Amino acid sequence: MSVDKRTLIAVIGDEDTTTGLLLAGIGQITKETNEKNFFIYEDGKTTKEQILNNFINYTQERQDIAILLINQHIAEKIRSDIDNYTNAFPAILEIPSKDHPYDPEKDSVLKRVRRLFGE
């Protein structure tokens, strides 16, 4: 599928973050396959495998996702996979959550940009 077909924003986030983004209008359930473009992480219940499976689904299997938003504290649980992701689409953006502030030192995209500019 071409880049112009990538029209959705996906989210892997905690309940508060995901709910806020759904209320803002990013929620989508695909009619044909009944797939959601969001995954709610539950602390103490969600496994690393579940996070990784959704990450792979949104970045490799689904061809309609343009941007993947992921809470940074959840991204830490699959850091090596995020660091090794090099495709332009979907773009991965790490975002803060209500209980976990954003740390630019952990952000893979920011690290790549710094390396590119020799910082």
Swiss-Prot record:
CC per GO annotation: fungal-type vacuole membrane; vacuolar proton-transporting V-type ATPase, V1 domain
A Pfam family it matches: ATP-synt_F
UniProt-annotated location(s): Vacuole membrane
One function term, GO molecular function aspect: proton-transporting ATPase activity, rotational mechanism
Gene3D superfamilies named among the record's database cross-references: ATPase, V1 complex, subunit F
InterPro entries: ATPase_V1-cplx_f_g_su, ATPase_V1-cplx_fsu_euk, ATPase_V1_fsu_sf
Record key words, sorted: Hydrogen ion transport, Ion transport, Membrane, Transport, Vacuole
Membrane topology field: Peripheral membrane protein
Quaternary structure note: V-ATPase is a heteromultimeric enzyme composed of a peripheral catalytic V1 complex (components A to H) attached to an integral membrane V0 proton pore complex (components: a, c, c', c'', d, e, f and VOA1).
UniProt similarity note: Belongs to the V-ATPase F subunit family.
Function: Subunit of the V1 complex of vacuolar(H+)-ATPase (V-ATPase), a multisubunit enzyme composed of a peripheral complex (V1) that hydrolyzes ATP and a membrane integral complex (V0) that translocates protons. V-ATPase is responsible for acidifying and maintaining the pH of intracellular compartments.
UniProt protein name: V-type proton ATPase subunit F
Organism, scientific name: Vanderwaltozyma polyspora (strain ATCC 22028 / DSM 70294 / BCRC 21397 / CBS 2163 / NBRC 10782 / NRRL Y-8283 / UCD 57-17) (Kluyveromyces polysporus)
